[in-house]
């Protein structure tokens, strides 16, 4: 097995081998990125089984579209982008995006996390966001998309994207305050 792994010294060698239809390279891609990409899919699709299905569909799309990878930029970034798009298509197909169409343009609040909060706790808070808020928050804060790109991907206006992000941040800040308050009560008891 180590011989197989050493054949693909970097992500570009791996991509080239996949473009040539090399099954071992496809396996290697899956082994290398499955857990990361499942985490990406899970940010958009809460149900674990559905997130796994989305991830598998994403890998199938990668294998179908591998010739479109132009060796400019990160291969992992290209893979991640496909996974995000696959998750968004799944959510759209299930009509799970319930976006507030009021499109009130609000400037994002300054968003500060308590240094005491654990990453796992924060991920749970993000997962508890209403679907529309969660989608925009993940795309903007985690994936790094612009409001224009988010608007195009979700079929909403830029103003709605900004509003959803602002509301997601306010929601998370409120959860953080509640968390800090309950932690202080525990420490003072």
Question: Model-flagged regions — what are they?
Answer:
Residues 1-8, 17, 152-155, 169-189:
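C-terminal edge and immediately downstream basic/flexible tail or linker adjoining helix-turn-helix-like DNA-binding
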Residues 39, 53-60, 73-85:
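Structural recognition of an alpha-helix C-terminal capping motif at a helix-to-coil junction
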Residues 67-71, 81-101, 167:
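Arg/Lys-rich amphipathic alpha helix in sigma70-family domain 2
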Residues 7-11, 89, 96-124, 146:
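Internal acidic/polar
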Residues 19-20, 46, 56-74, 93-94:
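Sigma70-family region 2
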Residues 15-39:
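A short, charge-rich alpha-helical start-of-domain segment used by transcription regulators
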Residues 136-140:
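A short pre-motif secondary-structure segment
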Residues 84, 88, 142, 154-178:
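DNA-recognition helix of helix-turn-helix
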